[in-house]
Amino acid sequence: MATTSTTGSTLLQPLSNAVQLPIDQVNFVVCQLFALLAAVWFRTYLHSSKTSSFIRHVVATLLGLYLAFFCFGWYALHFLVQSGISYCIMIIAGVESMQQCCFVFALGYLSVCQITRVYIFDYGQYSADFSGPMMIITQKITSLAYEIHDGMFRKDEELTPSQRGLAVRRMPSLLEYVSYTCNFMGILAGPLCSYKDYIAFIEGRASHVAQPSENGKDEQHGKADPSPNAAVTEKLLVCGLSLLFHLTISNMLPVEYNIDEHFQATASWPTKATYLYVSLLAARPKYYFAWTLADAINNAAGFGFRGYDKNGVARWDLISNLRIQQIEMSTSFKMFLDNWNIQTALWLKRVCYERATFSPTIQTFFLSAIWHGVYPGYYLTFLTGVLMTLAARAVRNNFRHYFLEPPQLKLFYDLITWVATQITISYTVVPFVLLSIKPSFTFYSSWYYCLHVCSILVLLLLPVKKSQRRTSTQENVHLSQAKKFDERDNPLGQNSFSTMNNVCNQNRDTGSRHSSLTQ
């Protein structure tokens, strides 16, 4: 019998009983499918060429709030409270310090909600809790605060290229702000997007992106808006396959079996390593489903266009949250993290890593743990992740250049690093799935903390080279587009100082994880 536990509507309880899935998960999927249809309608009948930005903002906001109340009931008021108070802080605190005040309040409010949900209501229950959307709203609030701070307080020469490209030069109106944080396309599962990208989409400027010509220069083509139909269809196919895999295979390979006493006592090391990998592999399709569906919804509305490739084919991956092929074929810890929950990784980079004055890696992992929630397993995963990241970086910097030639040696190196990466990632994230301290330590004990020990030895024995903070190619493409939009809004390229002083950095989210599809 499917559970009837939900804070939202029980209208779909008969469907929940029929498919034997919890009502909160049914509500989430049905609302996302409704959002998909609404997105098609929004792009067709409320296109920026047919209606004003005001109407598009209002409709996107009202639909988003309706979906939120349907899924979460009165708990959805937290979305408005958190967003509303943060907006007031932006106005009152001023552009000099608003980013710090908004960061502390938004993250603190999220943490309080997570603590009450976990330790007062349903510890260990992966329901479609209201803190999931709040995680995305928190990303948007803090991103916008830093972006306004960068655009209205700091001098251009003080900004990095990424910060300069995403800087917001004027204070958003209340409607623009609420539309950005609570629109129907991203209210339930994200992903995070930058404020400038969202406003460009609403105002109809996002599709006017220059296409690279044969001589390498950008040319503005006078073609109609690119159609997202092919991209949406492809992503819906991925959603269907991911959901099918999750409903059929995932339950046959539970992560908890890694700490089964009989399995630990009888399984050989190759068997343990193999099952560890396949059980964590089977745990990923639920994320593939949720994030890819969220991406498809945004694309169906016309949001997510990132220009054309060299063949003139439209790309709809501006706010994509993952790259499945790169994840499954990752040959380094960094490669895996760069392609998993992409928008959240960008948020962490922009609000923490690039701004940290010391130990940026440690601070970033700590912020990630706080943002994800209060389960002890999260912190154990991210503490382990810091160790694994530093060790993997040291190994790569010291040895990779020896294996680049000939191609056969490079292939051998890639195979070995693929195996090492997949086992290390699986080993690291087991506590994230198990949640609690005791089962997590039971797992690590059964492995004799071997990867922890190896990582410590690597850091002690190998010289550690400091890595430079770089901007990715995708980010550079996005920033060049953002710069064009910014110049269009502010032709003189000057910082405008408003009486509503505020501050904001750059952030593109990511989505974040949606609890309804987490074990």
Swiss-Prot record:
EC number in record: 2.3.1.-, 2.3.1.23, 2.3.1.n7
Entry's Gene Ontology BP terms: phosphatidylcholine acyl-chain remodeling; phosphatidylethanolamine acyl-chain remodeling; phosphatidylserine acyl-chain remodeling; phospholipid biosynthetic process; regulation of chondrocyte differentiation
Functional note: Acyltransferase which catalyzes the transfer of an acyl group from an acyl-CoA to a lysophospholipid leading to the production of a phospholipid and participates in the reacylation step of the phospholipid remodeling pathway also known as the Lands cycle. Catalyzes the acylation of lysophosphatidylcholine (1-acyl-sn-glycero-3-phosphocholine or LPC) and to a lesser extend lysophosphatidylethanolamine (1-acyl-sn-glycero-3-phosphoethanolamine or LPE). Does not acylates lysophosphatidic acid (LPA) and lysophosphatidylserine. Prefers oleoyl-CoA as the acyl donor.
Keywords: Acyltransferase, Endoplasmic reticulum, Lipid biosynthesis, Lipid metabolism, Membrane, Phospholipid biosynthesis, Phospholipid metabolism, Transferase, Transmembrane, Transmembrane helix
Induction data: Increased during chondrogenic differentiation.
Record's protein name: Membrane-bound glycerophospholipid O-acyltransferase 2
Lineage, uppermost ranks: Eukaryota, Metazoa, Chordata, Craniata, Vertebrata
Gene Ontology molecular-function annotations: 1-acylglycerophosphocholine O-acyltransferase activity; 1-acylglycerophosphoethanolamine O-acyltransferase activity; 1-acylglycerophosphoserine O-acyltransferase activity
